Regions:
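Short, extreme N-terminal segment that most often corresponds to the first beta-strand
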Residues: 1-23
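Short, mixed-charge low-complexity intrinsically disordered segments
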Residues: 10, 34-37, 43, 47-100, ...
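Intrinsic disorder/low-complexity segments
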Residues: 17-31, 96-97
C-alpha cells in the first residue's frame, strides 16, 4: 500500500558551515532527527497538510560555537507491506520553501533569498543597517 508521508527533519549546522543552509539541507544526512508527522492516502491530501508547515531557522549561541537549527518538512512517498512496515521509499516530492528576507531599517524587504549564505553576505557587505528575517 502506498502512502504519502509528511516528515519533519531538524538539523543543527555550525555557523562556519552557513553555505550548507539551503532548501533540503535537513534531509538524508547523518546528523538529522526525522519525525513522521502524518501519513496520507493521496498526494493532494499530503500537499494540503504540508501547506500548514513552514521551514524554520533559529540562530543560537552555543558554549563553543554559534549554530543554526534548521527545521524543514517534506512529502515522501512510501510503500508499506501487509505488516505495516516500509518496504520502499521514493524521492521527495515537495519540501517546504526556504525563504530568507533581508530588511532595511524601515522593515522594507530589500531582497529575498533561498539560502542563508547569500542573505548573510548582503547584510554584512551593505552600507545600510540590514536585518535577516527567517
Amino acid at each position: 500500500m502506498k502512502k504519502w508521508n509528511i516528515y519533519k527533519a531538524t538539523r543543527e549546522i555550525k555557523e562556519k558551515y552557513i553555505s550548507e543552509i539551503v532548501q533540503g539541507c535537513t534531509f538524508f544526512c547523518d546528523d538529522v532527527f526525522e519525525e513522521l508527522i502524518k501519513s496520507c492516502d493521496t498526494l493532494e491530501e499530503a500537499r494540503e497538510v504540508l501547506k500548514k508547515y513552514k521551514t524554520d531557522i533559529t540562530y543560537y549561541s552555543g558554549n563553543t560555537e554559534d549554530c543554526y537549527l534548521i527545521t524543514e518538512y517534506c512529502i515522501l512517498p512510501e510503500i508499506y507491506d501487509e505488516d505495516g512496515e516500509i518496504v520502499e521509499s521514493g524521492d521527495i516530492v515537495e519540501i517546504t520553501e526556504m525563504k530568507i528576507s533581508v530588511e532595511d531599517e524601515e522593515w522594507n524587504v530589500v531582497k529575498t533569498f533561498d539560502n542563508l549564505k547569500e542573505a548573510d553576505d548582503l547584510v554584512h557587505n551593505d552600507e545600510r543597517e540590514l536585518t535577516l528575517v527567517y
